[in-house]
Swiss-Prot record:
Belongs to the bacterial ribosomal protein bL19 family. The keyword Ribosomal protein applies. Transmembrane segments: none annotated. InterPro entries: Ribosomal_bL19, Ribosomal_bL19_CS, Ribosomal_bL19_sf, Translation_prot_SH3-like_sf. Keywords: Ribonucleoprotein, Ribosomal protein. GO terms for molecular function: structural constituent of ribosome. The gene is rplS. NCBIfam families: rplS_bact (TIGR01024). This protein is located at the 30S-50S ribosomal subunit interface and may play a role in the structure and function of the aminoacyl-tRNA binding site. This is Large ribosomal subunit protein bL19. The keyword Ribonucleoprotein applies.
């Protein structure tokens, strides 16, 4: 085995098998595990996926939402143990791989048309 095959086999052990099919433009609810003191809880973070990056164990999504008039973006590693679950709330119809133009838009201009041809 060469080095690349060894790395892929080690990464394959840590991949999450039950991730939903997600695309840029989808509205998702990401459950993030948070440890406070001795307790662990799951905090939901809901927003629109504006970018997806890489593949394999390094696959990331950038989720954007507007909270109290301020745009907040978080980058999540999909295969991280900190991610408890990912739930697709709504499918979006977009024609771009990256939706960075939404950063400059405010209010109703940030809406994305809903897509019905893909199941939730």
């Amino acid at each position: 085995m060469n080095a690349e095959q060894i790395i892929k086999s080690i990464e394959a052990e840590h991949l999450k098998p039950n991730l939903p099919v997600i695309h840029v433009g989808d509205t998702v609810r990401v459950g993030v595990r948070i440890i406070e003191g001795g307790k662990e809880r799951v905090q939901p973070y809901e927003g629109t996926i504006i970018a997806m990056g890489n593949s394999g164990i390094n696959k990331t999504i950038t989720v954007r939402r507007v909270f109290q008039g301020v745009g907040v973006e978080r980058v999540f590693l999909l295969h991280s143990p900190r991610i408890a679950n990912i739930q697709v709330i709504r499918r979006g119809k977009v024609r771009r791989a990256k939706l960075y133009y939404l950063r400059d838009r405010v209010g109703k201009a940030t809406r994305i048309q809903q897509r019905f041809d893909r199941p939730l």
